[in-house]
Protein backbone atom coordinates (compact mmCIF):
# COMPACT_ATOMS: atom_id res chain seq x y z
CA UNK A 1 0.00 0.00 0.00
CA UNK A 2 1.34 3.48 -0.79
CA UNK A 3 2.10 5.88 2.01
CA UNK A 4 -1.04 8.03 2.23
CA UNK A 5 -1.03 11.73 1.75
CA UNK A 6 -2.26 13.82 4.64
CA UNK A 7 -6.01 13.31 4.65
CA UNK A 8 -7.12 15.97 2.18
CA UNK A 9 -10.07 18.24 2.80
CA UNK A 10 -11.69 17.25 -0.47
CA UNK A 11 -15.32 16.81 -1.22
CA UNK A 12 -17.79 16.71 -4.06
CA UNK A 13 -16.70 17.40 -7.60
CA UNK A 14 -13.05 18.13 -6.78
CA UNK A 15 -12.64 14.83 -4.96
CA UNK A 16 -14.30 12.87 -7.75
CA UNK A 17 -12.10 14.52 -10.38
CA UNK A 18 -8.97 13.61 -8.42
CA UNK A 19 -10.11 10.00 -8.25
CA UNK A 20 -11.16 9.81 -11.91
CA UNK A 21 -7.80 11.23 -12.97
CA UNK A 22 -6.22 8.04 -11.60
CA UNK A 23 -8.83 5.35 -12.26
CA UNK A 24 -8.92 6.41 -15.93
CA UNK A 25 -5.86 4.20 -16.29
CA UNK A 26 -7.97 1.23 -15.21
CA UNK A 27 -10.58 2.41 -17.72
CA UNK A 28 -7.91 2.19 -20.42
CA UNK A 29 -6.89 -1.32 -19.35
CA UNK A 30 -10.49 -2.55 -19.37
CA UNK A 31 -11.08 -0.89 -22.73
CA UNK A 32 -8.31 -3.08 -24.13
CA UNK A 33 -10.17 -6.05 -22.63
CA UNK A 34 -13.57 -5.04 -23.98
CA UNK A 35 -12.47 -4.19 -27.53
CA UNK A 36 -11.59 -7.77 -28.61
CA UNK A 37 -14.13 -9.53 -26.37
CA UNK A 38 -16.93 -9.86 -28.94
CA UNK A 39 -14.52 -10.44 -31.84
CA UNK A 40 -12.03 -13.12 -30.83
CA UNK A 41 -14.40 -16.10 -30.28
CA UNK A 42 -15.87 -15.73 -33.76
CA UNK A 43 -12.46 -15.06 -35.28
CA UNK A 44 -10.95 -18.22 -33.78
CA UNK A 45 -13.95 -20.40 -34.66
CA UNK A 46 -15.18 -19.01 -37.98
CA UNK A 47 -12.10 -17.45 -39.57
CA UNK A 48 -9.30 -19.63 -38.24
CA UNK A 49 -11.42 -22.79 -38.26
CA UNK A 50 -10.73 -24.02 -34.72
CA UNK A 51 -13.34 -25.66 -32.51
CA UNK A 52 -15.54 -23.91 -29.97
CA UNK A 53 -13.24 -25.30 -27.25
CA UNK A 54 -10.31 -23.27 -28.57
CA UNK A 55 -12.50 -20.21 -29.04
CA UNK A 56 -13.52 -20.43 -25.39
CA UNK A 57 -9.97 -21.13 -24.24
CA UNK A 58 -8.63 -18.00 -25.93
CA UNK A 59 -11.06 -15.91 -23.88
CA UNK A 60 -10.64 -17.86 -20.63
CA UNK A 61 -6.84 -17.64 -20.62
CA UNK A 62 -7.06 -13.96 -19.73
CA UNK A 63 -9.19 -14.66 -16.66
CA UNK A 64 -6.90 -17.45 -15.44
CA UNK A 65 -3.86 -15.19 -15.87
CA UNK A 66 -5.60 -12.40 -13.95
CA UNK A 67 -6.54 -14.77 -11.14
CA UNK A 68 -3.03 -16.20 -10.76
CA UNK A 69 -1.19 -12.88 -11.03
CA UNK A 70 -3.42 -10.72 -8.84
CA UNK A 71 -1.74 -11.55 -5.48
CA UNK A 72 1.64 -10.70 -7.01
CA UNK A 73 0.25 -7.40 -8.26
CA UNK A 74 -0.75 -6.46 -4.73
CA UNK A 75 2.63 -7.33 -3.26
CA UNK A 76 4.56 -5.43 -5.92
CA UNK A 77 2.28 -2.42 -5.44
CA UNK A 78 3.11 -2.48 -1.73
CA UNK A 79 6.86 -2.70 -2.30
CA UNK A 80 7.41 -0.68 -5.51
CA UNK A 81 4.55 1.79 -5.39
CA UNK A 82 1.30 1.71 -7.35
CA UNK A 83 2.32 4.00 -10.23
CA UNK A 84 5.02 1.60 -11.42
CA UNK A 85 2.54 -1.28 -11.22
CA UNK A 86 -0.04 0.61 -13.29
CA UNK A 87 2.53 1.43 -15.99
CA UNK A 88 3.67 -2.20 -16.00
CA UNK A 89 0.07 -3.35 -16.39
CA UNK A 90 -0.58 -0.93 -19.25
CA UNK A 91 2.56 -2.21 -20.97
CA UNK A 92 1.00 -5.67 -20.74
CA UNK A 93 -2.14 -4.33 -22.42
CA UNK A 94 0.04 -2.87 -25.20
CA UNK A 95 1.86 -6.17 -25.69
CA UNK A 96 -1.45 -8.02 -25.89
CA UNK A 97 -2.38 -5.81 -28.85
CA UNK A 98 0.99 -6.62 -30.39
CA UNK A 99 0.16 -10.31 -29.96
CA UNK A 100 -3.13 -9.86 -31.81
CA UNK A 101 -1.35 -7.92 -34.57
CA UNK A 102 1.24 -10.64 -35.15
CA UNK A 103 -1.52 -13.27 -34.99
CA UNK A 104 -3.33 -11.47 -37.78
CA UNK A 105 -0.14 -11.18 -39.83
CA UNK A 106 0.52 -14.94 -39.48
CA UNK A 107 -3.04 -15.99 -40.36
CA UNK A 108 -1.68 -18.31 -43.04
CA UNK A 109 -0.09 -20.37 -40.24
CA UNK A 110 -3.14 -21.15 -38.06
CA UNK A 111 -1.32 -22.91 -35.22
CA UNK A 112 1.27 -20.14 -34.88
CA UNK A 113 -1.48 -17.53 -35.09
CA UNK A 114 -3.49 -19.27 -32.37
CA UNK A 115 -0.45 -19.50 -30.09
CA UNK A 116 0.19 -15.78 -30.54
CA UNK A 117 -3.43 -15.02 -29.67
CA UNK A 118 -3.16 -17.17 -26.55
CA UNK A 119 0.08 -15.45 -25.56
CA UNK A 120 -1.56 -12.06 -26.01
CA UNK A 121 -4.48 -13.10 -23.81
CA UNK A 122 -2.19 -14.31 -21.02
CA UNK A 123 -0.20 -11.06 -21.11
CA UNK A 124 -3.46 -9.08 -21.07
CA UNK A 125 -4.64 -10.96 -17.98
CA UNK A 126 -1.44 -10.14 -16.13
CA UNK A 127 -1.62 -6.52 -17.29
CA UNK A 128 -5.22 -6.18 -16.11
CA UNK A 129 -4.47 -7.45 -12.61
CA UNK A 130 -1.54 -5.04 -12.24
CA UNK A 131 -3.33 -2.02 -13.73
CA UNK A 132 -6.53 -2.65 -11.77
CA UNK A 133 -4.90 -3.24 -8.38
CA UNK A 134 -2.36 -0.47 -8.90
CA UNK A 135 -4.91 2.16 -9.94
CA UNK A 136 -7.00 1.55 -6.83
CA UNK A 137 -4.00 1.90 -4.53
CA UNK A 138 -2.71 4.91 -6.46
CA UNK A 139 -6.08 6.60 -6.10
CA UNK A 140 -6.09 5.94 -2.36
CA UNK A 141 -2.58 7.38 -2.10
CA UNK A 142 -3.68 10.55 -3.90
CA UNK A 143 -6.93 11.34 -2.06
CA UNK A 144 -6.27 9.68 1.30
CA UNK A 145 -7.45 6.45 2.86
CA UNK A 146 -10.61 8.12 4.21
CA UNK A 147 -11.96 7.87 0.66
CA UNK A 148 -10.92 4.29 -0.12
CA UNK A 149 -14.55 3.19 -0.55
CA UNK A 150 -15.17 5.93 -3.09
CA UNK A 151 -12.00 5.02 -5.00
CA UNK A 152 -13.07 1.37 -5.21
CA UNK A 153 -16.55 2.44 -6.32
CA UNK A 154 -15.21 4.63 -9.11
CA UNK A 155 -12.91 1.82 -10.23
CA UNK A 156 -15.97 -0.39 -10.63
CA UNK A 157 -17.84 2.30 -12.55
CA UNK A 158 -15.04 2.80 -15.08
CA UNK A 159 -14.67 -0.96 -15.42
CA UNK A 160 -18.32 -1.35 -16.39
CA UNK A 161 -18.14 1.67 -18.67
CA UNK A 162 -15.05 0.44 -20.49
CA UNK A 163 -16.45 -3.05 -21.03
CA UNK A 164 -19.81 -1.72 -22.22
CA UNK A 165 -18.13 0.72 -24.59
CA UNK A 166 -15.37 -1.59 -25.77
CA UNK A 167 -17.37 -4.57 -27.03
CA UNK A 168 -19.48 -2.75 -29.67
CA UNK A 169 -16.57 -0.51 -30.69
CA UNK A 170 -14.39 -3.58 -31.15
CA UNK A 171 -16.90 -5.07 -33.58
CA UNK A 172 -16.98 -1.80 -35.55
CA UNK A 173 -13.18 -1.62 -35.79
CA UNK A 174 -12.95 -5.29 -36.77
CA UNK A 175 -15.46 -4.89 -39.60
CA UNK A 176 -13.62 -1.76 -40.69
CA UNK A 177 -10.07 -3.10 -40.84
CA UNK A 178 -9.89 -6.67 -39.59
CA UNK A 179 -7.93 -8.02 -36.64
CA UNK A 180 -4.87 -5.91 -37.48
CA UNK A 181 -6.84 -2.66 -37.26
CA UNK A 182 -8.39 -3.74 -33.96
CA UNK A 183 -4.95 -4.64 -32.63
CA UNK A 184 -3.56 -1.23 -33.58
CA UNK A 185 -6.45 0.51 -31.79
CA UNK A 186 -5.75 -1.55 -28.65
CA UNK A 187 -2.05 -0.70 -28.82
CA UNK A 188 -2.92 2.97 -29.31
CA UNK A 189 -5.23 3.05 -26.26
CA UNK A 190 -2.56 1.43 -24.08
CA UNK A 191 0.21 3.69 -25.40
CA UNK A 192 -1.77 6.89 -24.76
CA UNK A 193 -2.51 5.70 -21.20
CA UNK A 194 1.18 4.92 -20.60
CA UNK A 195 2.24 8.35 -21.86
CA UNK A 196 -0.33 10.02 -19.59
CA UNK A 197 0.68 7.94 -16.55
CA UNK A 198 4.44 8.42 -16.71
CA UNK A 199 4.49 12.19 -15.91
CA UNK A 200 2.05 11.84 -12.99
CA UNK A 201 3.50 12.32 -9.48
CA UNK A 202 4.58 9.13 -7.77
CA UNK A 203 3.03 7.97 -4.51
CA UNK A 204 5.70 6.50 -2.26
CA UNK A 205 5.62 2.83 -1.46
CA UNK A 206 5.18 1.89 2.18
CA UNK A 207 8.24 1.10 4.24
CA UNK A 208 7.86 -1.80 6.58
CA UNK A 209 8.14 -5.55 6.77
CA UNK A 210 5.32 -7.21 4.82
CA UNK A 211 3.26 -9.99 6.32
CA UNK A 212 3.50 -13.45 4.74
CA UNK A 213 0.75 -14.25 2.26
CA UNK A 214 -0.77 -16.78 4.65
CA UNK A 215 -1.11 -14.12 7.34
CA UNK A 216 -2.75 -11.68 4.90
CA UNK A 217 -5.13 -14.39 3.72
CA UNK A 218 -6.00 -15.23 7.31
CA UNK A 219 -7.12 -11.66 7.95
CA UNK A 220 -9.22 -11.13 4.82
CA UNK A 221 -10.63 -14.54 3.90
CA UNK A 222 -13.92 -14.13 5.75
CA UNK A 223 -14.62 -10.87 3.94
CA UNK A 224 -13.60 -12.58 0.73
CA UNK A 225 -15.99 -15.46 1.39
CA UNK A 226 -18.88 -13.05 1.90
CA UNK A 227 -17.94 -11.34 -1.37
CA UNK A 228 -17.73 -14.68 -3.18
CA UNK A 229 -21.16 -15.77 -1.97
CA UNK A 230 -22.73 -12.46 -2.98
CA UNK A 231 -21.04 -12.60 -6.38
CA UNK A 232 -23.03 -15.73 -7.22
CA UNK A 233 -26.09 -13.52 -7.72
CA UNK A 234 -24.25 -11.36 -10.22
CA UNK A 235 -22.90 -14.46 -11.94
CA UNK A 236 -26.27 -16.14 -12.53
CA UNK A 237 -27.84 -12.94 -13.84
CA UNK A 238 -24.98 -12.09 -16.19
CA UNK A 239 -24.67 -15.65 -17.49
CA UNK A 240 -28.17 -17.11 -17.51
CA UNK A 241 -30.75 -14.31 -17.65
CA UNK A 242 -31.06 -14.83 -21.42
CA UNK A 243 -31.79 -18.54 -20.93
CA UNK A 244 -34.23 -17.65 -18.15
CA UNK A 245 -36.20 -15.37 -20.48
CA UNK A 246 -36.10 -17.99 -23.25
CA UNK A 247 -37.41 -20.67 -20.89
CA UNK A 248 -40.29 -18.37 -19.93
CA UNK A 249 -40.99 -17.44 -23.54
CA UNK A 250 -40.41 -13.75 -22.84
CA UNK A 251 -38.62 -11.02 -24.77
CA UNK A 252 -36.42 -8.37 -23.19
CA UNK A 253 -33.44 -10.23 -21.72
CA UNK A 254 -31.03 -7.61 -23.08
CA UNK A 255 -33.09 -4.85 -21.46
CA UNK A 256 -32.94 -6.74 -18.16
CA UNK A 257 -29.14 -6.75 -18.35
CA UNK A 258 -29.24 -3.02 -19.07
CA UNK A 259 -31.39 -2.51 -15.97
CA UNK A 260 -28.88 -4.46 -13.89
CA UNK A 261 -25.98 -2.33 -15.15
CA UNK A 262 -27.87 0.94 -14.66
CA UNK A 263 -28.82 -0.03 -11.11
CA UNK A 264 -25.23 -1.07 -10.37
CA UNK A 265 -23.67 2.16 -11.62
CA UNK A 266 -26.51 4.37 -10.38
CA UNK A 267 -26.29 3.08 -6.82
CA UNK A 268 -22.56 3.80 -6.68
CA UNK A 269 -23.16 7.32 -7.97
CA UNK A 270 -26.10 8.03 -5.64
CA UNK A 271 -24.47 6.80 -2.41
CA UNK A 272 -20.78 7.74 -2.64
CA UNK A 273 -20.47 8.46 1.10
CA UNK A 274 -22.61 5.64 2.45
CA UNK A 275 -19.65 3.51 3.53
CA UNK A 276 -17.99 6.38 5.42
CA UNK A 277 -21.25 7.36 7.10
CA UNK A 278 -22.56 4.04 8.42
CA UNK A 279 -19.61 1.66 8.01
CA UNK A 280 -18.69 -0.98 5.49
CA UNK A 281 -20.29 -3.95 7.24
CA UNK A 282 -23.60 -2.12 7.71
CA UNK A 283 -23.67 -1.13 4.04
CA UNK A 284 -22.85 -4.71 3.05
CA UNK A 285 -25.73 -6.12 5.11
CA UNK A 286 -28.20 -3.65 3.58
CA UNK A 287 -26.91 -4.54 0.12
CA UNK A 288 -27.23 -8.27 0.77
CA UNK A 289 -30.84 -7.80 1.87
CA UNK A 290 -31.72 -5.89 -1.30
CA UNK A 291 -29.91 -8.43 -3.49
CA UNK A 292 -31.74 -11.34 -1.83
CA UNK A 293 -35.14 -9.72 -2.50
CA UNK A 294 -34.15 -9.13 -6.11
CA UNK A 295 -32.97 -12.69 -6.72
CA UNK A 296 -36.09 -14.13 -5.08
CA UNK A 297 -38.27 -11.96 -7.31
CA UNK A 298 -36.47 -13.26 -10.39
CA UNK A 299 -36.75 -16.86 -9.21
CA UNK A 300 -40.51 -16.73 -8.59
CA UNK A 301 -41.34 -14.34 -11.45
CA UNK A 302 -44.49 -15.23 -13.37
CA UNK A 303 -44.50 -12.05 -15.47
CA UNK A 304 -41.68 -10.10 -17.13
CA UNK A 305 -42.12 -7.02 -14.94
CA UNK A 306 -41.42 -9.09 -11.82
CA UNK A 307 -38.16 -10.34 -13.29
CA UNK A 308 -37.13 -6.85 -14.35
CA UNK A 309 -37.78 -5.41 -10.89
CA UNK A 310 -35.85 -8.33 -9.42
CA UNK A 311 -32.88 -7.75 -11.72
CA UNK A 312 -32.95 -4.03 -10.90
CA UNK A 313 -32.89 -4.74 -7.15
CA UNK A 314 -30.16 -7.36 -7.53
CA UNK A 315 -27.99 -4.87 -9.42
CA UNK A 316 -28.57 -2.16 -6.83
CA UNK A 317 -27.88 -4.59 -3.99
CA UNK A 318 -24.68 -6.02 -5.44
CA UNK A 319 -23.34 -2.60 -6.40
CA UNK A 320 -21.73 -1.59 -3.10
CA UNK A 321 -20.83 -5.06 -1.81
CA UNK A 322 -17.27 -5.03 -3.16
CA UNK A 323 -16.26 -1.57 -1.84
CA UNK A 324 -18.14 -2.01 1.46
CA UNK A 325 -16.40 -5.24 2.41
CA UNK A 326 -13.16 -4.18 0.72
CA UNK A 327 -12.78 -1.13 2.98
CA UNK A 328 -12.98 -3.35 6.06
CA UNK A 329 -10.73 -6.03 4.58
CA UNK A 330 -7.82 -3.75 3.70
CA UNK A 331 -7.95 -2.06 7.10
CA UNK A 332 -7.56 -5.44 8.79
CA UNK A 333 -3.85 -5.48 7.88
CA UNK A 334 -0.93 -3.08 8.37
CA UNK A 335 -0.54 -0.30 5.84
CA UNK A 336 2.41 -1.95 4.10
CA UNK A 337 0.24 -5.00 3.34
CA UNK A 338 -2.94 -3.34 2.15
CA UNK A 339 -2.11 -3.83 -1.52
CA UNK A 340 -1.71 -7.55 -0.95
CA UNK A 341 -4.92 -7.56 1.09
CA UNK A 342 -6.93 -5.86 -1.66
CA UNK A 343 -5.56 -8.22 -4.30
CA UNK A 344 -6.20 -11.31 -2.17
CA UNK A 345 -9.73 -10.12 -1.38
CA UNK A 346 -10.44 -9.59 -5.09
CA UNK A 347 -9.34 -13.14 -5.91
CA UNK A 348 -12.43 -14.43 -4.09
CA UNK A 349 -14.67 -12.63 -6.57
CA UNK A 350 -12.60 -13.94 -9.49
CA UNK A 351 -12.96 -17.50 -8.21
CA UNK A 352 -16.66 -17.11 -7.53
CA UNK A 353 -17.43 -15.86 -11.02
CA UNK A 354 -15.28 -18.65 -12.44
CA UNK A 355 -17.17 -21.48 -10.72
CA UNK A 356 -20.68 -19.99 -10.65
CA UNK A 357 -21.32 -20.62 -14.34
CA UNK A 358 -20.51 -24.35 -14.43
CA UNK A 359 -22.16 -25.10 -11.07
CA UNK A 360 -25.29 -23.13 -11.90
CA UNK A 361 -25.41 -24.89 -15.25
CA UNK A 362 -25.46 -28.27 -13.51
CA UNK A 363 -28.22 -27.16 -11.14
CA UNK A 364 -30.18 -25.69 -14.04
CA UNK A 365 -30.02 -28.92 -16.06
CA UNK A 366 -31.30 -30.86 -13.06
CA UNK A 367 -33.93 -28.52 -11.58
CA UNK A 368 -34.70 -25.83 -14.16
CA UNK A 369 -33.58 -22.27 -14.75
CA UNK A 370 -35.55 -20.42 -12.02
CA UNK A 371 -34.01 -22.58 -9.29
CA UNK A 372 -30.55 -21.12 -9.81
CA UNK A 373 -31.83 -17.68 -8.77
CA UNK A 374 -33.39 -19.10 -5.62
CA UNK A 375 -30.14 -20.94 -4.88
CA UNK A 376 -28.15 -17.75 -5.43
CA UNK A 377 -30.48 -15.93 -3.01
CA UNK A 378 -29.67 -18.63 -0.45
CA UNK A 379 -25.93 -18.05 -0.92
CA UNK A 380 -26.35 -14.31 -0.47
CA UNK A 381 -28.35 -15.01 2.70
CA UNK A 382 -25.35 -16.97 4.01
CA UNK A 383 -23.16 -13.95 3.17
CA UNK A 384 -25.57 -11.77 5.17
CA UNK A 385 -25.30 -14.05 8.21
CA UNK A 386 -21.52 -14.21 7.89
CA UNK A 387 -21.27 -10.42 7.76
CA UNK A 388 -23.56 -10.10 10.77
CA UNK A 389 -21.22 -12.44 12.68
CA UNK A 390 -18.21 -10.38 11.58
CA UNK A 391 -19.90 -7.24 12.90
CA UNK A 392 -20.61 -8.88 16.26
CA UNK A 393 -17.12 -10.27 16.87
CA UNK A 394 -14.62 -8.23 18.93
CA UNK A 395 -12.37 -5.98 16.81
CA UNK A 396 -8.95 -7.44 16.07
CA UNK A 397 -5.80 -5.54 16.93
CA UNK A 398 -4.12 -4.10 13.84
CA UNK A 399 -0.46 -3.10 14.16
CA UNK A 400 0.28 0.60 14.46
CA UNK A 401 1.54 0.77 10.87
CA UNK A 402 -2.01 0.49 9.69
CA UNK A 403 -3.52 3.04 12.01
CA UNK A 404 -3.06 5.95 9.66
CA UNK A 405 -5.25 4.28 7.07
Curated annotation (Swiss-Prot):
Induction: Induced by arabinose. Disruption phenotype: Deletion increases intracellular arabinose concentrations as compared to the wild type. Its main location: membrane. Keywords: Cell inner membrane, Cell membrane, Membrane, Transmembrane, Transmembrane helix, Transport. Pfam families: MFS_1 (PF07690). PROSITE patterns: MFS. Residues 40-46, 106, 177, 245-251, 304-308, 365 are periplasmic. Residues 1-18, 68-84, 128-155, 199-223, 273-282, 330-343, 387-405 are cytoplasmic. It is found in: Cell inner membrane. One of its GO terms (molecular function) is transmembrane transporter activity. It comes from the Bacteria. HAMAP family: MFS_YhhS. Confers high-level resistance to glyphosate when overexpressed. Overexpression has no effect on intracellular arabinose concentrations. Belongs to the major facilitator superfamily. YhhS family. This is Uncharacterized MFS-type transporter YhhS. It comes from Escherichia coli (strain K12). The gene is yhhS.
